[in-house]
Regions:
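Non-heme di-metal
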Residues: 1-173
Length: 173
C-alpha cells in the first residue's frame, strides 16, 4: 500500500486528542454496555470488518477512503478494549445476553457489492453506531467514559460526512 497507516488515520479522524482511559471504578454493567459497541452487531469490530470487505471490492480511490476509515475504527476498538480492561472486564469479542455468551459473527456485516449500496450501508452503520453510543452515554454515570464516547462520536460523524460526500461525487443525489 502506498502511504503510511498513520497518514490514513490522520485523514479520517477529527484530529482532536482522545481522553485518557480512566474510570471511576470497575463496573460490569458499564462494561456490558461498552461491549455492545466493542464487539456487538453494531460495533467497532463489525465496522472494521465491513470496511475491510468493502475496500477489497472497490476501486483505488474508494478503497483508500474505506481503508482509512477502517484504521480509525481499529483505534476506536483499541480504546474500547482498554476501557473494558479498566472496567474490570476481559476484552473478548463476545457479549452476554440472557446469561449466554454470544460471540461476534461475520453475519453482522453488510455484504453489498454495488458501490451505491456499499456507501449507503456504511453511512447507515455509522449512524447506528452514533445512536448506540449516545444511548450508552445516557445510561453511564462516569464523566470519563462519557468523554471517551463523545470523542469517538466526533470521528463517526466525520465518517458520515466523508461517506456522504463520496456518495454525492460517485453516485449523485
Amino acid at each position: 500500500m502506498k502511504g503510511d497507516y498513520k497518514d490514513l488515520q490522520d485523514s479520517y479522524s477529527l484530529g482532536l486528542p482522545y481522553p485518557k482511559i480512566k474510570v471511576y471504578d470497575k463496573n460490569s454493567i458499564y462494561a456490558d454496555l461498552i461491549k455492545k459497541s466493542y464487539a456487538g452487531e453494531v460495533s467497532e469490530l463489525t465496522a472494521i470488518t465491513q470496511y475491510t470487505y468493502h475496500q477489497l471490492i472497490t476501486s483505488d480511490y474508494i478503497k483508500n477512503t474505506l481503508k482509512g476509515i477502517a484504521i480509525v475504527e481499529m483505534h476506536h476498538l483499541e480504546i474500547l478494549g482498554e476501557l473494558l480492561i479498566a472496567l474490570g472486564e476481559n476484552p473478548t469479542f463476545l457479549l452476554r445476553k440472557k446469561n449466554k455468551d454470544l460471540y461476534w459473527s461475520s453475519k453482522f456485516i453488510a455484504k453489498d457489492i454495488c458501490l451505491k449500496e456499499i456507501l449507503l450501508s456504511d453511512i447507515k452503520s455509522e449512524k447506528e453506531a452514533i445512536e448506540q453510543y449516545r444511548k450508552t452515554a445516557n445510561i453511564i454515570d462516569d464523566e470519563n467514559i462519557i468523554a471517551i464516547i463523545n470523542r469517538i462520536i466526533l470521528d463517526e460523524e466525520l465518517h458520515i460526512k466523508i461517506l456522504s460526500n463520496l456518495y454525492e461525487k460517485e453516485i449523485g443525489k
